[in-house]
């Protein structure tokens, strides 16, 4: 397997024989309590609710802030819920322009920090929180 370096753009262009289209990220989570999830993402992280189907059998919401979209499904099928518990070893990283202001907003909303602001050896400054369902979020300075 080839090991690429950060400046491998010319090699990348040779390997990709088809045009590369833009990609965005939407992550899906599977909390038990959609109301708590909506409250957290709207009140604590200032997302806006873009779809609300909590009145349906398969309850679903979609939230958005900037280029980040979060879908949350409360499935009525037990096997689906069990298979999608918060994963260990995964952190969802949200980049912001002002990580200090973001931390201050989170703490002002009364949300506990899993880890306070810290400068990392690899460069960025970040803090960490858990959402109501236990998903681990790292909020960090935007990488340039």
Each PLM stretch: what is its role?
Residues 63-66, 129-132, 142:
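Active-site beta-strand termini and strand-to-loop segments that position acidic
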Residues 28-70:
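Core segments of cupin and vicinal oxygen chelate
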């Amino acid at each position: 397997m080839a090991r690429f370096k950060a400046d491998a753009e010319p090699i990348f262009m040779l390997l990709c024989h088809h045009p590369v289209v833009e990609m965005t990220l939407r992550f899906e989570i599977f909390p038990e309590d959609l109301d708590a999830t909506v409250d957290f993402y709207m009140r604590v992280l200032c997302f806006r609710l873009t779809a609300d189907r909590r009145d349906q059998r398969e309850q679903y919401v979609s939230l958005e802030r900037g280029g980040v979209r979060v879908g949350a499904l409360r499935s009525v099928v037990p096997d689906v819920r069990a298979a999608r518990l918060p994963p260990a070893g995964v952190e969802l990283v949200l980049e912001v322009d002002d990580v200090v202001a973001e931390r201050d907003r989170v703490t002002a909303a009364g949300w506990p920090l899993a880890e306070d602001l810290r400068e990392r050896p690899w460069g960025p400054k970040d803090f960490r929180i858990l959402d109501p369902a236990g998903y681990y979020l790292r909020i960090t300075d935007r990488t340039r």
